[in-house]
Regions:
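Polar/acidic, low-complexity leader/linker segments enriched in S/T/G and N/D
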Residues: 1-37, 138-155
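Residue microenvironments linked to proteolytic maturation
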Residues: 5, 12, 55-151
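Short low-complexity stretches enriched in small and charged residues
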Residues: 13-26, 45-51, 70-74
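Intrinsically disordered, low-complexity segments enriched in polar/charged residues with Gly/Pro
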Residues: 26-28, 40-43, 67-69, 103
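Short conserved beta-strand and strand-loop elements enriched in small hydrophobics
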Residues: 34-47, 91
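A glycine-rich, hydrophobic loop/mini-helix early in the fold
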Residues: 41-60
């Protein structure tokens, strides 16, 4: 199954010093092709179920990625079903940040991309799966109302 969605909203300003990606860092990720081949997992745990095949920035500057989920594995098949059913509706970008300590201040250094995650509800606003295509099928576009959990009153993570 192929998936496309927003894995990170538009980046922060160049003067930002924090844990989120700056816009220029997102541009570098795309330019250098660093998302290509990054593992796709579920809910910040578990086995790899696929890989990122492409990435781009949309007109708002948000990081988009195209992922291929391996449906020949049990885990990949289940995750694909969760996407089709709206149970896994969001994406999360997993990365580490090298935080430097000096003069009683913290400075965010290099960010290392680790994984893209299919999640029930992402931590960042607007990071949704927007479309998928099962093997041999047509493209299915998702809308925020497709969230299977929306009928339940769920606590915020």
């Amino acid at each position: 199954m192929l998936l496309v969605g927003t894995c990170n909203p538009s980046g922060e300003a160049a003067t930002y010093n924090g844990l989120y990606y700056k816009q220029e860092e997102l541009q570098e990720l795309v330019r250098d092709g660093r998302l290509r081949g990054v593992p796709v997992k579920t809910e910040h745990t578990g086995l790899e179920i696929g890989r990122v095949v492409s990435s781009f920035l949309d007109s708002r500057g948000a990081q988009q990625c195209v992922m291929e989920v391996d449906e020949s594995t049990v885990e990949g098949s289940i995750a694909s079903g969760f996407v089709r059913d709206g149970i896994a509706a969001d994406l999360s970008l997993g990365y580490s940040v090298d935080v430097q300590h000096s003069d009683d201040r913290l400075k965010a250094g290099e960010k290392r991309l680790l994984e893209i995650l299919l999640v029930r509800r992402g931590a960042r606003e607007g990071c949704h799966i927007s479309a998928y295509q099962a093997d041999g099928g047509g493209v299915v576009f998702k809308t925020p109302q497709d969230d299977a959990w929306s009928c339940f009153e769920m606590p915020q993570d």
